[in-house]
């Protein structure tokens, strides 16, 4: 879960 969340956040930036 955290992995996907961090990945999506990093993709935004």
UniProtKB/Swiss-Prot annotation:
Q: Where is it predominantly found?
A: secreted
Keyword Phosphoprotein carried by entry: no
Please indicate which superkingdom the organism of origin belongs to: Eukaryota
**Among its keywords, does the record have Hydrolase?**
no
A single Gene Ontology CC annotation of this entry is: extracellular region
Q: List Phenylalanine amide occurrences by residue.
A: 13
Query: Where, by tissue, is this protein expressed?
Result: Expressed by the skin glands.
Name of this protein? Temporin-1R
